[in-house]
């Protein structure tokens, strides 16, 4: 019985963790999904953003008590403006998706929503982590030796 409980807890922890991309695997995936150069943002900048927002983790979430919103997924897309989590007050849902779609191992919907975010006037500057860690920095290390 204890062995089954331990196995169940182990499987639960693996499920909650989600997919943590290897750096070059993510770079290739983002390129394949059309983010390289989208709205003038280099692939290296997208990689830097994903590193600092989620550490390449598809299941990353971060609650923001001030706005009572949550950031979701590999790009930490916010429920106040971009997705619907059913609990954020006055949510806009500009990407027209449930926030749970941003937590999937298949990041196709997360990339589509990130494209929507970066298409707004703030562009890539909409992400605080990008402004803090990537803006005006040499971000080439995030794609180095990835063949992209």
From Swiss-Prot:
One of its GO terms (biological process) is defense response to Gram-negative bacterium. The active site is at 53, 71. Pfam families: Lys. CDD domains: LYZ_C. InterPro entries: Glyco_hydro_22, Glyco_hydro_22_CS, Glyco_hydro_22_lys, Lysozyme-like_dom_sf. It is found in: Secreted. It catalyses: Hydrolysis of (1->4)-beta-linkages between N-acetylmuramic acid and N-acetyl-D-glucosamine residues in a peptidoglycan and between N-acetyl-D-glucosamine residues in chitodextrins. Residues 19-148 form the C-type lysozyme domain. Keywords: Antimicrobial, Bacteriolytic enzyme, Disulfide bond, Glycosidase, Hydrolase, Secreted, Signal. Belongs to the glycosyl hydrolase 22 family. Lysozymes have primarily a bacteriolytic function; those in tissues and body fluids are associated with the monocyte-macrophage system and enhance the activity of immunoagents. This is Lysozyme C. It comes from Phoca vitulina. The gene is LYZ.
